[in-house]
Amino acid sequence: SIILLFFYHPLYQNYTSLMNTSFSFFYYIWCVLLTLSLCLTFFKVTSLKNFIIFLSLFFFIGLILPYHKNYPIFSTLHVFIPLSCIIIALLFLAYLIKNKQKSEPILAHKIYLWFSYGLSIIAMFIIFFSQINGLIEISVLLFINFILYVLQRSWDIHIAYLVLSLMNRTLNFLK
């Protein structure tokens, strides 16, 4: 995802803007890799494989639909489908964290706090920029992968704190 930042300005555009340029090939490769990566990472933390495959397919279909003023229906679906899939994925992460409370209540509470912090940061970015741009897209992807990583590994939360602090400092620097 970060490599694609060299092809557009993340504060003013999002990844979809690559679809309408000569770099569209990279956009489609990114869509495939992103979908596979998220799908395989979710497989490591849950046994609901059919649900994840269904969600991943819808996410991919939404990403590859054309976003162009000549195709308003496709443009609407291009925005609505991936956004819905991300919201469902975030709700599913909250569900996984809730289930983690049964086996590791203290760790689950700490993960839930990180989950809340991440959602707050993303909401702050959406309010601040008043549109979905590349920075928000990258933040959401990093956030989902971070929570999945912590759920998968169940490592000490201090390591997770260092990673999130580094992300926060980097994002503050970009402002």
Language-model features: where?
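Aromatic-anchored segments of alpha-helical transmembrane domains
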Residues: 2, 56-65, 118-127
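Hydrophobic cores of alpha-helical transmembrane segments in multi-pass inner/ER membrane proteins
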Residues: 28-40, 85-95, 140-153
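Cytoplasmic-side transmembrane-helix entry/capping segments in multi-pass membrane proteins
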Residues: 50-53
